[in-house]
Amino acid sequence: MPHDPSFTPTQLAARAAYLLRGNDLGTMTTAAPLLYPHMWSWDAAFVAIGLAPLSVERAVVELDTLLSAQWRNGMIPHIVFANGVDGYFPGPARWATATLADNAPRNRLTSGITQPPVHAIAVQRILEHARTRGRSTRAVAEAFLDRRWGDLMRWHRWLAECRDRNERGRITLYHGWESGMDNSPRWDSAYANVVPGKLPEYQRADNVIITDPSQRPSDGEYDRYLWLLEEMKAVRYDDERLPSVMSFQVEDVFFSAIFSVACQVLAEIGEDYKRPHADVKDLYLWAERFRAGVVETTDQRTGAARDFDVLAEKWLVTETAAQFAPLLCGGLPHDRERALLKLLEGPRFCGHPDLKYGLIPSTSPVSRDFRPREYWRGPVWPVLTWLFSWCFARRGWAERARLLRQEGLRQASDGSFAEYYEPFTGEPLGSMQQSWTAAAVLDWLG
C-alpha cells in the first residue's frame, strides 16, 4: 500500500496550535509569517475562533487588540500594522491614515478600508467555549463583552448607516480588498472602469515572496488597487466625500450576507447577556434588512446572488462562491433555495468530477474566468469552507455541514496550512503557515 503522508487529527491539531503560537507577536497574531506579517481584520476574527478552544483568554486578547485600532467613526480597518515590522506593501506610509484621516486611531497604524464583519461569530464562539470552562474563564469572556459591546455596536452601526446610505440592505465597497476576495472575477468589470492617474512609485512585496506569477494579481491590477488608495487619500478618507470621488463602488452581496448573519448573532448574544434593548432591536432590524437585500439580488430561477455596480448601475453576474450568499443568511423562498443548493452540489461547483475534494472552489471550474492557481479566481480557501460549514450547521443542515468539515479536514491533513489549494490536484498554494487555515482546523477538531 502507498504511504499516506497525511497527519492524524491529533497530530494536525498539535501542528495547528504550534503554528498559531509561532505566528503570535504577543497581543496579535500575524496572518502569515512572511506574506502577511501584520493583523488583518477578518483573519483576526477567525484566529480568535481557533484560539478559543486553546485559550479563551488569548482569544479575547486577539479581539481586544483589533478593537483597540477601531476608528472613531466605528470602522474596523482591514489591517492593523505591527510595530516595527516591514515587509508588506502597501504599508502605513502609503496609506497615510495617521496624518490624513481624522477618524483614524492615534495609538495604532492602520489601513483606511474595512473587511467582512465576521467578528460577532468569533465573540459567540469565545462565549461558547468559556461556558464549558471554570468561573474565572467565564468571567474573562463576559468582561470582554462588557468592555467591547459598545465598540461592536459602533462597528455594526457604521456599516448599516455609512455603507448602506439608501437602506437597500447591501453594503457598498470602495475597494475590492474590502470584500476579502481581492481579485475575484466579481470585480473585473468594475475595475475595468478604474483608470489610474500618475501613481507614486512602488515596489510590490507579495510577488517577491510568492514567485509563481500564476498565483498572484498582475501589475496592471495592482496599479488599479493603488489608484483607489490615492482617491481615498485625496478626500482624507472622509465617509461623506468618498461616494463623490471613488471610481470603484459596488454593492457586495457576500459581505452583506455575512453582515446579516453577524447582526443576528450579535442580537442573540445581546439577549442572552442582557444588553440594552434598543441595541438588540437595531441588530435584529439590520439582520432582516440585509437578508432582504441579499434575496433581492437573486436570480428568480436558480437563486444565485449577484453583486451590483453602483456607478455603472448594473448587476454583476459571475460564477463564484459569492453566488451562494443567501445560503449563509437565509431568506430565499423554498424552491429557489433548493435550486441554489442543487447548483452548489452539482457539477459547476462541489460536484465537479475533477475536484480533488468535494469543496467549494472560489470560482466555478466551468467559468471562463476560472484560473485554478490564482488567488480568488479558482482555488479552494479553507476559511471559506469553514464559514459555509458553520452557517450550514447554524441553519440546521447538519449533514451538509459535516461533509464540508470532513472534506476540509482531508484537504488540510497535509499539514501545510496553506492560504488556498489547487482544486484539482490539492496542491497547497499561496502563503504557507496561514493562521486562519490553522484556526479553521482547530475549530473543526474542537
UniProtKB/Swiss-Prot annotation:
- Database matches in Gene3D superfamilies: 1.50.10.10
Q: What is the effect of changing residue 419 to A?
A: Loss of catalytic activity
- Domain of life, per lineage: Bacteria
| Gene Ontology biological process terms from the UniProt entry | oligosaccharide metabolic process; protein N-linked glycosylation
Q: Where is the active site?
A: 182, 419
GO terms, molecular function: Glc3Man9GlcNAc2 oligosaccharide glucosidase activity; glucosylglycerate hydrolase activity
Q: Where does substrate bind?
A: 36, 40-43, 88, 115, 180, 216, 375-376, 434
UniProt keyword Hydrolase present: yes
Q: What is the pH dependence described in this protein's record?
A: Optimum pH is 6.0 (tag-less variant). Optimum pH is 5.8 (C-terminally tagged variant).
**E.C. no:** 3.2.1.208
Q: What induces it?
A: Up-regulated in response to nitrogen shock.
Q: Which reaction does it catalyse?
A: (2R)-2-O-(alpha-D-glucopyranosyl)-glycerate + H2O = (R)-glycerate + D-glucose
Q: Name one Pfam family in it.
A: MGH1-like_GH
Q: What InterPro entries does the annotation carry?
A: 6-hairpin_glycosidase_sf, 6hp_glycosidase-like_sf, Glycoside_hydrolase_63, MGH1-like_GH
Q: How would the record characterize activity across temperature?
A: Optimum temperature is 50-55 degrees Celsius (tag-less variant). Optimum temperature is 42 degrees Celsius (C-terminally tagged variant).
Q: Which residues form a coiled coil?
A: none
Is the keyword Amino-acid biosynthesis in the record?
no
Going by the UniProt record, its keywords in alphabetical order are: Glycosidase, Hydrolase, Stress response
Mechanisms controlling activity: Activity is not dependent on divalent cations, but it is enhanced by Mg(2+).
Task: Relate the protein's function as given in its record.
Answer: Catalyzes the hydrolysis of glucosylglycerate (GG) to glycerate and glucose. Involved in recovery from nitrogen starvation by promoting the rapid mobilization of the glucosylglycerate that accumulates under these conditions. Can also hydrolyze mannosylglycerate (MG), with tenfold lower efficiency.
Q: Quaternary form?
A: Homotetramer. Dimer of dimers.
Recorded family membership: Belongs to the glycosyl hydrolase 63 family.
Annotated protein name in UniProt: Glucosylglycerate hydrolase
> Source species, please?
Mycolicibacterium hassiacum (strain DSM 44199 / CIP 105218 / JCM 12690 / 3849) (Mycobacterium hassiacum)
